[in-house]
A protein has these predicted regions:
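Domain-scale signature associated with acetyltransferase and cell-envelope carbohydrate enzymes
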Residues: 1-102, 125-127, 134, 144, ...
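Glycine-rich NAD(P)-binding loop of Rossmann-like domains
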Residues: 114-125
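A generic "structured core" feature
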Residues: 125, 142-143, 147-149, 153
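Short-chain dehydrogenase/reductase
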Residues: 129, 147-148, 164-166
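Extended serine/threonine-enriched, polar tracts that run as long, contiguous segments within proteins
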Residues: 130, 137-139
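Gly/Pro- and small hydrophobic-enriched strand-loop and loop-to-helix capping segments
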Residues: 155-167
Length: 196
């Protein structure tokens, strides 16, 4: 892990315990930790609970930016999270590999002689599952209990919970759906279907 800058603030809220923040976590999809992560904090990085970062991640927080994790979060390998304003991950929000999320476009664009703000906050709700190769752009709100399918681009706010978002750009594809996060329930279904 490369600590490029720690000029900002790292805030640990709640009960602090060993393993609360893990960087370079190995799992079945990432069996070695030779990929370096880059941590560049000039703004605020806020932890309200446990967060696991796989290898090869980039966290870039500009002086005016903030990234906040509510706990039971995981960020998959090769993910990039970049903030100039505010990015908030709700409780038990899990993200697979190659996530790209940025609350800025970095460059200004003139459209019909008007230059709009290129920075807007992002909020991801509780109990969300963001699959691999997903991009989330500025100004997006993803509600609680949402699944975002692989290879999707989320560029607008959604309000309805218990949906599957998919596509470029992402649209609601299925209603009344949610990922199972409970370990015991998942073990039951693995056994039920003969996977254990």
């Amino acid at each position: 892990t490369v600590l490029r800058s720690l000029k900002g603030n790292i805030k640990l809220n709640g009960k602090i315990r060993f393993g609360m923040i893990s960087i370079g976590v190995n799992n079945i999809f990432n069996s070695h930790n030779s990929y370096k992560s880059i941590i560049d904090i000039d703004g605020d990085l806020i932890f309200n609970g446990k967060v696991d970062f796989n290898t090869g991640i980039v966290l870039k927080i500009f002086k005016t930016g903030a990234i906040e994790f509510d706990g039971r979060n995981s960020i998959g390998r090769f993910s990039q999270i970049i903030s100039k304003k505010n990015i908030h991950f709700g409780y038990c929000c899990r993200c697979s590999w190659n996530l790209y999320i940025s609350d800025t476009d970095f460059h200004f664009v003139k459209f019909k002689n008007i230059i709009h703000n290129n920075v807007k906050p992002i909020s991801i709700g509780n109990n969300c599952w963001i699959a691999n190769n997903v991009s989330i752009s500025k100004g997006v709100t993803i509600p609680n209990n949402t699944i975002v399918a692989s290879n999707s681009y989320v560029n607008k706010t959604f309000e309805q919970e218990y949906t599957l978002l998919a596509g470029i750009p992402a649209k609601i594809k299925i209603n009344d759906v949610a990922r199972v996060f409970d370990v015991e329930e998942e073990a039951y279904w693995n056994k039920y279907y003969g996977w254990m």
